[in-house]
Amino acid sequence: MPRKGHIAKRDVLPDPVYNSKVVTKFINSIMEDGKKGVAQKICYEAFGLIAKRSGKEALEVFEEAMNNVMPLLEVKARRIGGATYQVPIEVRPERRQTLGIRWMLIAARKRGEKLMSERVAGELLDASNNTGAAVKKREDTHKMAEANKAFAHYRY
């Protein structure tokens, strides 16, 4: 907790190709060891593959995939009187986006394709069709929240 007040949130610049802040966040999440050029190459190659395979605009497929992966609810552990309850809570919009991107890339990294751009493209296409590991993660999270709906009154 900072003692000197609230720290202003830094705003990311939209990416140069698609002029989208979400794509910039996606690229920043792909990036490892500060190698942004490599991350951009992976992302834009994946978008090229998506456009080729689906015949649709890559950004449309990306946005549809993100909407299918972003969770609405999640559970948070809350300790009450010696018992720990999984309390379902709504997810804030910014966290929804962050979780969606994170789950998408975790699922992409676990895929079997040789190139990362192919993995990302495959996962985005699967997610836009409501299949794939990232969508399954979202469904599992929602099931957990649904199963623990009885503890919703312990909300934060």
UniProtKB/Swiss-Prot annotation:
Entry's Gene Ontology BP terms: translation
Any single Pfam family the record assigns to this protein: Ribosomal_S7
Gene Ontology CC terms: small ribosomal subunit
InterPro entries: Ribosomal_uS7, Ribosomal_uS7_bac/org-type, Ribosomal_uS7_CS, Ribosomal_uS7_dom, Ribosomal_uS7_dom_sf
Signal peptide range: none
GO molecular function, one term: tRNA binding
Keywords: Ribonucleoprotein, Ribosomal protein, RNA-binding, rRNA-binding, tRNA-binding
Function in brief: One of the primary rRNA binding proteins, it binds directly to 16S rRNA where it nucleates assembly of the head domain of the 30S subunit. Is located at the subunit interface close to the decoding center, probably blocks exit of the E-site tRNA.
Protein family per UniProt: Belongs to the universal ribosomal protein uS7 family.
Subunit structure: Part of the 30S ribosomal subunit. Contacts proteins S9 and S11.
Identification of the protein by name: Small ribosomal subunit protein uS7
Organism: Clostridium beijerinckii (strain ATCC 51743 / NCIMB 8052) (Clostridium acetobutylicum)
Originating gene: rpsG
